Amino acid sequence: MDKKYDITAVLNDDSSINAVSDNFQITLDARPKEKSKGINPLSAFLAGLAACELATANAMAAAKMITLNKALINIKGYRLTNPSDGYFGLRELNIHWEIHSPNEEEEIKEFIDFVSKRCPAHNTLHGTSNFKINISVTLVH
């Protein structure tokens, strides 16, 4: 089955942005933190990536015989604000997983690799040029 994603974003008079999808709304705002009314759009993008990775892990864990007692992701992104090559996008992501599980470390690393290949957001980004994704994992027993 094909899946379609439909987002509508509206620029407000105060420069914040309201984005709506499936009757849910989020406020985004690229202004400095002291004036901001919502999450930075690029941070929201990275939050979407993290949520997609976690949802994929949750959906696939039982089939892969992985016990997820707790899972969290921290993503740090890097970009140049004044690039000499004209590329303003993210240059690098560091994705750090913290997995609480009785499984062995090698099982978890293989599982995270599998999840990253199955996650639609990660898979989309992986094919983008001028972009690097680094993944690290912390296993907590």
Swiss-Prot record:
Disruption phenotype: Mutant is highly sensitive to killing by tert-butyl hydroperoxide (t-BHP) and H(2)O(2). PANTHER family: HYDROPEROXIDE REDUCTASE. It is an enzyme of class 1 (oxidoreductase). Its EC number is 1.11.1.-. GO terms for molecular function: peroxidase activity. InterPro entries: KH_dom-like_a/b, OsmC/Ohr_fam, OsmC/Ohr_hydroprdx_reductase, OsmC/Ohrsf. Belongs to the OsmC/Ohr family. Induction: Down-regulated by osmotic shock and ethanol. Not induced by oxidative stress. Reduces organic and inorganic peroxide substrates. Protects the cell against oxidative stress. It is found in: Cytoplasm. This is Hydroperoxide reductase. GO terms for cellular component: cytoplasm. Homodimer. Keywords: Cytoplasm, Oxidoreductase, Peroxidase. It comes from Mycoplasma genitalium (strain ATCC 33530 / DSM 19775 / NCTC 10195 / G37). It holds the Pfam family OsmC.
